[in-house]
Amino acid sequence: MTVGDHLVARMRAAGISVVCGLPTSRLDSLLVRLSRDAGFQIVLARHEGGAGYLADGFARASGKSAAVFVAGPGATNVISAVANASVNQVPMLILTGEVAVGEFGLHSQQDTSDDGLGLGATFRRFCRCSVSIESIANARSKIDSAFRALASIPRGPVHIALPRDLVDERLPAHQLGTAAAGLGGLRTLAPCGPDVADEVIGRLDRSRAPMLVLGNGCRLDGIGEQIVAFCEKAGLPFATTPNGRGIVAETHPLSLGVLGIFGDGRADEYLFDTPCDLLIAVGVSFGGLVTRSFSPRWRGLKADVVHVDPDPSAVGRFVATSLGITTSGRAFVNALNCGRPPRFCRRVGVRPPAPAALPGTPQARGESIHPLELMHELDRELAPNATICADVGTCISWTFRGIPVRRPGRFFATVDFSPMGCGIAGAIGVALARPEEHVICIAGDGAFLMHGTEISTAVAHGIRVTWAVLNDGQMSASAGPVSGRMDPSPVARIGANDLAAMARALGAEGIRVDTRCELRAGVQKALAATGPCVLDIAIDPEINKPDIGLGR
């Protein structure tokens, strides 16, 4: 068995089936192996960053890791995607091709080894594990340690640097007998015991106004339906953090929507004004998004806090916690469902969910289109199998406000690290993981200009994605903060760009909507497209400035 054979075996056992990136001679032997294995699909991206975001979207939608292959400068291009996966606890395998071991530190072209450019230090900062294979003697142990980290909790990216001359080298005979040890075994934390479940349910029974908040830390646990069933038994209102949106449906009678930035205020009102007397937080980091930039209101929080997170360092970091439970969201909800039933109580102060299309939708000037008009038109026309991916910028706020989550697991966004353009390629990864669903990505024109070339990837692989692009000719999130203090043109204006024409040039369908009277027909045509399609919507730049409620 060679090093390459062992690596492919570990990838297969870890459930990796999608490998994306750009071709590199440093990994040619490995790519040949993968191409000959029917269990792997190779996706040729147009940019290494796009490959990383595609793998990210696939993992979020499927719960399984994907692999990314890069080399040389491509390894620096993928860093933002790796950092994004790290912040959001998304499992991903990054394979970087290295020069031959004998060339380390000799100023060989594109030497990114620790003796060259030293990119390993950067990957170690963002990855759960980063290893560099430097000899046959330690190849197996280093590869195995990386895959153990890939399966560990909290989830996250791992990195393996593989010199091109070692891929085809045979492992020492004494290592072959242990090559299969531990393959595919996902290390999970032991479920919390009945004592913890009894304690939580006891506190719940004694509370008058409890609240459950679900964060991104439990997204990959797939507990949406289970936790809602428990909430129904107890009459327990629930919300998500901005980064956890999509775990549960927002149209449920017990839903309070989103707590913090981008929320409609119902969850914040219930927490602080009711006031809530028991806050159960699962997979929540209590960072700036959920606390509205660490609003002073949180210092006066009256609720008893139960914090569940597999990362012990997250418990009590900002919010005073009376009970910390270090376990996964899945283990926690399983323990609750195995415990004694909670006492049902109709809770106080729960306002009904906001309607999907708010009456009196604001209109832009003349025939210009307000972003909420687009959101409500999309929401009206979306099929039951639709999944929304929101990119970064003002578009994400309009998406939160205008399109409610109707089914769990049908909304994806990267709100925490927020790399612009991540949703463009991420939507392709989601569609690759869920071919039976219609994936719609909502993005701004600035982000689209960064990673819009990945449309070509969707065209090449026949992947159906619809991109709805808010085109206002500016970086709106940058223009808002400086307006009134300087001319925003130097830092925000990107000019008029025909993105529908760009889509057609890349082989996709492109639809341009300039006026309100064209909006409904344009949306209907875009959603009816059977392949990759870009809906390019002209948005009034003076209107595209949502209030996200920082510090309230």
UniProtKB/Swiss-Prot annotation:
Thiamine diphosphate binds at E48. It comes from the Bacteria. InterPro entries: DHS-like_NAD/FAD-binding_dom, THDP-binding, Thiamin_PyroP_enz_cen_dom, Thiamin_PyroP_enz_TPP-bd_dom, TPP-bd_CS, TPP_enz, TPP_enzyme_TPP-bd. Binds 1 Mg(2+) ion per subunit. Pathway: Amino-acid biosynthesis; L-isoleucine biosynthesis; L-isoleucine from 2-oxobutanoate: step 1/4; Amino-acid biosynthesis; L-valine biosynthesis; L-valine from pyruvate: step 1/4. Its cofactor is Mg(2+); thiamine diphosphate. Residues 394-474 are annotated as: Thiamine pyrophosphate binding. Induction: The expression is up-regulated in the mid-exponential and extended stationary phase. It catalyses: 2 pyruvate + H(+) = (2S)-2-acetolactate + CO2. Catalyzes the conversion of 2 pyruvate molecules into acetolactate in the first common step of the biosynthetic pathway of the branched-amino acids such as leucine, isoleucine, and valine. This is Putative acetolactate synthase large subunit IlvB2.
